[in-house]
Amino acid sequence: MRVDRPRAVVSDPAMPHDPVRHLVAEVERLGTRALPYAELHREITDRLRQVLRIDAACWHGLDPDNRLPTTANPVELLANGFLTPQTEMAAARSVLASEYQRPDVNTFAALAGRRLPSAILSETTRGRPERSARYNDFLAPVGPPHEMRTVMVTLERAWGCVVFHRTAASGDFTTESSWPRPAWPNCSAATSPPTRP
């Protein structure tokens, strides 16, 4: 049975980058395939990598009523050696503490309330990522110090998010390098519940 999903706003015709238009179309197409979440996330990340350098992606599910995490998929962090089974729980505790127990920047709840629910850690901290507790006890020690977060919002409800990481060797995310941001609404619509396996 097919359930219609909320339709995202297609990118503005004046958008200067043809690759973004192509990316939006690809994400919309993926959204019609009813793929399991893990496979869909991998497919979207693979397409984003065609226009954006990403060393690791970590997708999360959020409860739209309270914005608490319901799932995490750190498979790329583990596969690329940034996390191990022994350090995964400590990293998860650090991320959760920054979301709900201590002040930090670019929390999922804060991003969900923005017009564009996406932010780069170094931009928010004005070039001083050490202002972030999450950076000090997770990102810097683990090895992918550069972070860009995006919350998936559909019909004003935040139900998921993705964190993109870069190593020091890859360089930081910048406004210029993150120009696929206009595709985020389409990512939200393509991956939104309720019929995803």
Language model regions located:
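Actinobacteria-biased recognition of intrinsically disordered, low-complexity terminal regions
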Residues: 1-20
